[in-house]
C-alpha cells in the first residue's frame, strides 16, 4: 500500500510542468489565493497526499496507475489533497492558530521526494503559509496545555472513552494507556480512519462502549 501511494506522489511530481497549468485553472475556478508560488503549492499537495489518504481511509485501489493521463492523476490528487488546505482565509484557520500555539502539528518528510520538489524544506510550513498574514512568524509553540492535559489524565481517573481509527495518522498522538486506571478506556477501530465513531465500531466494541456509558449515566 505504501509503495503504491509513494509511486503516485512521484508520478505527479515528475509531471509537474503538466500539472501546474491544471492547478492554476483549479485555483482560478475556486478563487483561491496563496502566500507561496504555485509550484510550491503543488509540492505541499503531494506531501499532504499520503496523510490525507490514510486519514480518511481512502482505499489505495482508487489510486490511478502511473500510466494514467495527466487529468486523471490531477483529479485524484484534488479529490484527496486539494490546495484549498493551504490557501489563505480558510474556515479552519482558527484551528491552525491553536495548533501553532498549543497543540502542535505534523510535519512532512521531504527526503524521498527531494529531487522533484521546488521547496528546499517543509520545516515550519504551518506558520509560514497557513496562519493569518498578521501572525506569520509571530506565534511560538507553548506546550503548557499539552502538559496540563497529560498530567490531568495521568494523575486522575476521569470517566472517559477514547476512540481512534487504526490507520488514521492522527492516532499516532493518541492518549497513553496509563497503568492502574479503572475508568480510562481506549478503543481502536480495526482499519478505521478519522471517521471512527461509536456507531460504526465493530459490534462487540460498540456494545462494550454503550454498556459502559449507560452504566456511568446511571450512577
Could you tell me what each predicted segment is?
Residues 16-141:
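Alpha/beta-hydrolase fold active-site neighborhood
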Amino acid at each position: 500500500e505504501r509503495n503504491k501511494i509513494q509511486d503516485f506522489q512521484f508520478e505527479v511530481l515528475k509531471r509537474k510542468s503538466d500539472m501546474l497549468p491544471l492547478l492554476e485553472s483549479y485555483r482560478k475556478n475556486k478563487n483561491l489565493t496563496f502566500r507561496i508560488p504555485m509550484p510550491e503549492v503543488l509540492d505541499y499537495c503531494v506531501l499532504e497526499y499520503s496523510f490525507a489518504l490514510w486519514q480518511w481511509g481512502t482505499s489505495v485501489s482508487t489510486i490511478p496507475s502511473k500510466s494514467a493521463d495527466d487529468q486523471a492523476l490531477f483529479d485524484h490528487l484534488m479529490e484527496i489533497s486539494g490546495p484549498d488546505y493551504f490557501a489563505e482565509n480558510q474556515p479552519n484557520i482558527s484551528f491552525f492558530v491553536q495548533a501553532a500555539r498549543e497543540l502542535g502539528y505534523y510535519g512532512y518528510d521531504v527526503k524521498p521526494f527531494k529531487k522533484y520538489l521546488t521547496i528546499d524544506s517543509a520545516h515550519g510550513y504551518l506558520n509560514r503559509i497557513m496562519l493569518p498574514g498578521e501572525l506569520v512568524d509571530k506565534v511560538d509553540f507553548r506546550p503548557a496545555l499539552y502538559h496540563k492535559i497529560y498530567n490531568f489524565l495521568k494523575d486522575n481517573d476521569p470517566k472517559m472513552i477514547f476512540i481512534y481509527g487504526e490507520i488514521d495518522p492522527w492516532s499516532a498522538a493518541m492518549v497513553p494507556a496509563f497503568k492502574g486506571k479503572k475508568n480510562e478506556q481506549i478503543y481502536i477501530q480495526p482499519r478505521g480512519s478519522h471517521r471512527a465513531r461509536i456507531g460504526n465500531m465493530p459490534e462487540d466494541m460498540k456494545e462494550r462502549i454503550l454498556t459502559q456509558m449507560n452504566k456511568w449515566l446511571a450512577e
